[in-house]
């Protein structure tokens, strides 16, 4: 889980509300780059499948639409006291995920602390950092890059 401000100078989560399903979140570590894709926003199975089939492999798209991740939304607005979003698999099941999920958390609406905006994404790939830097990554929309010092 990552939490950050979305307003003010240098706010890393300023554009979090513009994320769409399948947008990339990149985590650059010392030796690897992890690419996460934002999960579907809808809670309807058919819509979740159509939103995820364009970016995930077929097995993951099925898990996202009707399987173990069917109740994990890619975008959610919650109140500050809804601490269950900190759970590794925030669907109320108490299960541990067997695929990596990432949660981004910030204040909502902008310039307010009344609610929290939550974005969730599933791990898409882990690549050698040197090889990753040699190629161009296509972008289908907004994305987020987080680097390790």
PLM region spans:
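Extracytoplasmic/periplasmic soluble domains downstream of a signal peptide or transmembrane helix
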Residues: 1-149
């Amino acid at each position: 889980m990552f939490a950050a401000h979305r307003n003010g100078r240098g706010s890393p989560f300023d554009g979090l509300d513009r994320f769409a399903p399948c947008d990339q979140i990149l985590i650059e570590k010392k030796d690897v780059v992890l690419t996460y894709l934002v999960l579907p926003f809808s809670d309807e199975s058919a819509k979740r499948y159509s939103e995820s089939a364009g970016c995930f492999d077929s097995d993951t798209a099925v898990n996202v639409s009707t399987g173990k991740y069917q109740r994990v939304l890619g975008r959610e607005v919650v109140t500050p006291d809804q601490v269950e979003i900190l759970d590794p698999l925030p669907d109320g099941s108490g299960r541990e995920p067997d695929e990596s999920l990432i949660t981004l958390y910030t204040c909502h609406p902008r310039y307010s602390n009344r609610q929290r905006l939550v974005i969730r994404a599933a791990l898409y790939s882990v690549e050698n950092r040197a090889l990753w830097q040699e190629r161009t990554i296509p972008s289908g929309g907004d994305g987020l890059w987080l680097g390790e010092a």
